[in-house]
Swiss-Prot record:
Reaction equation(s) it catalyzes: Exonucleolytic cleavage in either 5'- to 3'- or 3'- to 5'-direction to yield nucleoside 5'-phosphates
One Pfam family linked to the record: Exonuc_VII_S
Function: Bidirectionally degrades single-stranded DNA into large acid-insoluble oligonucleotides, which are then degraded further into small acid-soluble oligonucleotides.
GO molecular function, one term: exodeoxyribonuclease VII activity
Protein's recorded name: Exodeoxyribonuclease 7 small subunit
GO biological process, one term: DNA catabolic process
């Protein structure tokens, strides 16, 4: 699975695959292929969400409050 997909692109592709599978008229081998691709897309989305959670933890700090921002040279 190409990791260069954005979260939104991966979700869109995943929704498309789920829609195809929900129709129920997909041959078994094709359904298995869709399922595998869907699992890869799901993993990619999970990784991207974890990255964002880590970034938010840094921004919010340990106590869940926004950390004060000091621009370079503003340290008084």
């Amino acid at each position: 699975m190409e990791n260069k997909l954005s979260f939104e692109e991966a979700i869109s592709q995943l929704e498309h695959l789920v829609s195809k599978l929900e129709q129920g008229d997909v041959p078994l081998e094709e359904a298995i292929s869709y399922f595998k691709e869907g699992m890869e897309l799901s993993k990619l989305c999970d990784e991207k969400l974890k990255d964002v959670q880590e970034q938010m933890a840094v921004i919010l700090g340990e106590d869940g409050q926004l950390e004060p921002f000091t621009a370079l040279g503003d340290e008084a």
